[in-house]
Amino acid sequence: MKENELKNEKSVDVLSFKQLESQKIVLPQDLFRSSFTWFCYEIYKSLAFRIWMLLWLPLSVWWKLSNNCIYPLIVSLLVLFLGPIFVLVICGLSRKRSLSKQLIQFCKEVTENTPSSDPHDWEVVAANLNSYLYENKAWNTKYFFFNAMVCQEAFRTTLLEPFSLKKDEAAKVKSFKDSVPYIEEALGVYFREVEKQWKLFNSEKSWSPVGLEDAKLPKEAYRFKLTWFLKRISNIFMLIPFLNFLCCIYVSRGMCLLLRTFYLGWILFMLVQGFQNMRMIVLSVKMEHKMQFLSTIINEQESGANGWDEIAKKMNRYLFEKKVWKNEEFFFDGIDCEWFFSHFFYRVLSAKKSMRALSLNVELWPYIKEAQLSCSEESLA
């Protein structure tokens, strides 16, 4: 009994130590008021910003010695307005260059800490890399990654997607050189953790809607899809583009009917595209939302249009309960749901080319294929 009590005490001590250790992780998001203040601090500490500030010394001397103030004024205005743009561009390029030189260390951190697609798993990786880059003088501050999500996105854009898109070994070696074996090991660890999360998600974390029989799709509440769409784009997310569209209607009142119709049609088309992309961005905030979408497609028993209607109802309820969307109107109907899957998941997988501001979903490729296969089998049945 005493031995068991000692073991229990030790296990409690280990757990409490791990909890304390996790609490000690400090990232810039814990030190700065917002990402904007962190960004301003990083710019202030950059070499490009200091060079831009030093440029004002010779300009001030020129102003004092010059008899003609026109040329100093022109140069000063150029430095004033174009200088910040160059500072931002140079700082962005410096970040990419610094990180590209530390790919091996990045991979070692991923291999050692085994993060999954959950952003919280990347906190240790982000904290360790922040310290490593500063201590090895690869970066001039201790705050390279603002938070875990920024670190995870850097892993995706720097390693995961570029490496996965390389077609053969020669192309990988040409682009990543000596880092190839480390990247392969890190990606292997990451994919295994994502697979564990997928299996856990489908078994223990499986979500089942309650009272779905009474749920209605937006197509049953709105007479036309355009009415539903106009209501959606008039919300807070699309308020500025919507007001811009109203402004375009006012500005175009002097045009001929044909030109005005074409112009306003093009503006409305751009609004539709922005709304569709916004939905995918909202869904991509957490990987578990995309996993739920794919899992719902795979596990749907009904086939054809009725099956997609059921998927749309379930996802509308899920996204509303998870507070991803403010109501149960994310998908208009089954056709809209099927288009969403085809456009943002299967099409990207087939082309293996990322869309603007959207992820390639490399870690979800096997499950996207499985979802597409289940759709094909249902249509054949």
Curated annotation (Swiss-Prot):
UniProt entry keywords in alphabetical sequence: Membrane, Transmembrane, Transmembrane helix
Compartment(s) of residence: Membrane
Keyword Glycoprotein among UniProt keywords: no
Transmembrane helix among keywords: yes
Transmembrane segments annotated in the record for this chain: 43-63, 73-93, 232-252, 255-275
Main location: membrane
Lineage top rank: taxon: Eukaryota
GO CC terms, sorted: endosome; fungal-type vacuole; fungal-type vacuole membrane
Pfam families tied to this protein: DUP
Extracellular side stretches: 64-72, 253-254
Family membership noted in the UniProt record: Belongs to the DUP/COS family.
Protein name, entry field: Protein COS1
Organism the protein comes from: Saccharomyces cerevisiae (strain ATCC 204508 / S288c)
Gene: COS1
